[in-house]
Amino acid sequence: MKTKLNFTGQAYDSSVIWIWLPLFLVLGLLVTGTQAIASSACAQTSKAALAACTSSATSDYWLGIGACDNLSDRQERQNCIDEARHSLNKEDLKTCNEQFQARQEVCRDLGGGPYDPDFSSENFVSNPADLTGNSYFPLTPGTYTYKSKDTAGNTLQTIVVRVKDDTTTIAGVLCRVVTDKVYEGAGTGGRLLEDTIDWYAQDSDGDVWYFGETTIAFTFDEAGNPTASTEGSWMAGMDEAKPGIIMFSVPEDQIGLLFRQEFALGTAEDLGRVIGTDASVTAGGVKYTGCVHTQDSTPLEPGVIEDKYYTPGVGLVLTVDPDGTREELIP
């Protein structure tokens, strides 16, 4: 083990630098990322999320260091520290930083104030018969089938969305129940990959709000055994989660503006931006005109932007992912 002298003339282990390196890194990210936006509520939220992310990313490292502290032999302790240091996942720390920077960009775009929308029940329709959505996001009962295709035209997934007659109450607000099932392959006979229940509400201006979801995603090992995850589930009013607007009744007034579609920090942070209201697209062999074009993103996946197109009287007809994958409504 190398031993050096500090400025007091006392000996210290150079390994100490490596032990505290993750903490120095976290502090460095906090200082660097907050220079542009002083101490606004939005910036403080970004810092809190960064701290949570880095804490998770360095948890195994610090537990390893704690175990090393209980080794009496210096060389064994040093070897233990080296092993713990090499177990540190730098990619996870990089992701934490990228998410932090993405949240800061959102703060610059939305302003530094807190996200605290008024979703009191008196601002929303309370009669199920009135819960019909708007022209670009209908909430009338019905079934929509989408096919997800790669750039070669191969069908990767089949998505079945059902707007149900059922309603429920979330945070005191009447919501329409919508189910969303994702199947592997070209039909509903493939493996179920995702099973989601969404909740949508409508305010007195006709804007459609997203009040949360409960979702189960399935992954499969080589033997075909499934593993289920509920990651991404959230509900407005629970654990400080808040709803957002999924579609404005007059999207023309929102062109170019960023807006939150949901907010459960670290779980659900989708945002939308209206790009235009007169797009023309072809999906499922049908040409649609006068479409609202939005771009959706989330700080949880920095740099990933989805282009979505909504046509009057129908709703969502096309989603285009960054890799060119197209999710098309099938008539």
Where are these regions (language model features)?
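Bacterial N-terminal signal peptides
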Residues: 19-32
